[in-house]
């Protein structure tokens, strides 16, 4: 549930918006616990080694664990109207069908067959460099992150960062401390902003500020698959 009209308005204005609680604390703990079970993952990425920041994340393999699959299926139709509205404003083709399964079939037919849901783990001193999760030609323009830990109790720092490159202006940044079990929806690549010619695309990157203490796990839900 949630006021999706207000959520859409905030995403339109800022490129991101807090969502309601998407998991129970028990579900969040269950997903955190999967991190040490390699059978659930297809790859582990050391961010320091790749100069992505510091910390580690793991790509889930499919079939996804139940809460992950349920969330992706529930969120896709909620985000679809925003995606289609943005495509119309930016004069881009709105490729996305009505269901996530149909969209993922399109990705797979185009050679993008690897699952992209990730579980990230940050410890004291870890951070995530500003980036965009673009893997192939087919892109769904919105994605969701969920904090699986309790800020203040489990960790300090680790704010979610969005930086928007504004046309002919300085970049604009926002920092959000994600509440436990709440989601945050944000743009994957760019968002439409009003310009003299109507609408133009403002590129947006996301990252995570340095974790000052504790441990922070997040679930990242990207709605396109990877080559």
Predicted regions and their residues:
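Catalytic core of Fe(II)/2-oxoglutarate
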Residues: 140, 151, 155-227
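A short glycine-rich, His/Asp/Glu-containing loop-to-beta-strand
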Residues: 17, 112-124
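Generic detector of contiguous secondary-structure segments
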Residues: 63-73, 105-106, 124-127, 141, ...
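Short, conserved beta-strand element in jelly-roll/cupin
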Residues: 121-124, 136-154
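Histidine-centered catalytic micro-motifs
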Residues: 128-135
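A structural signal for short, well-ordered beta-strand segments
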Residues: 117-119, 144-146, 219-223
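Non-heme Fe(II)/2-oxoglutarate
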Residues: 8-104
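N- or domain-start disorder-to-order transition segments that initiate the globular core
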Residues: 1-7
């Amino acid at each position: 549930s949630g006021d999706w009209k207000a959520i859409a308005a905030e995403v339109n204005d800022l490129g991101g918006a807090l969502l309601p609680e998407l998991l129970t604390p028990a579900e969040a703990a269950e997903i955190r616990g999967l991190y040490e079970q390699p059978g659930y993952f297809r790859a582990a990425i050391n961010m320091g080694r790749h100069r992505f920041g510091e910390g580690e994340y793991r790509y889930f393999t499919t079939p996804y664990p139940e809460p992950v699959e349920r969330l992706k299926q529930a969120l896709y139709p909620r985000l679809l109207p925003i995606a289609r509205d943005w495509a119309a404003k930016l004069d881009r083709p709105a490729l996305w069908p009505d269901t996530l399964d149909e969209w993922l079939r399109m990705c797979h037919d185009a050679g993008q067959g690897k699952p992209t849901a990730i579980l990230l783990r940050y410890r004291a001193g870890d951070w995530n460099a500003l980036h965009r999760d673009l893997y192939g030609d087919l892109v769904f323009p919105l994605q969701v992150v969920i904090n699986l830990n309790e800020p203040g109790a489990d960790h300090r720092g680790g704010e979610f960062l969005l930086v928007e490159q504004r046309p002919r202006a300085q970049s604009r940044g926002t920092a959000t401390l994600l509440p436990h079990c709440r989601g945050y929806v944000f743009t994957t690549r760019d968002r439409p902003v009003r310009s003299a010619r109507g609408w133009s695309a403002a590129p947006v990157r996301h990252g995570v500020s340095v974790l000052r203490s504790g441990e922070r796990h997040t679930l990242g839900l990207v709605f396109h698959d990877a080559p």
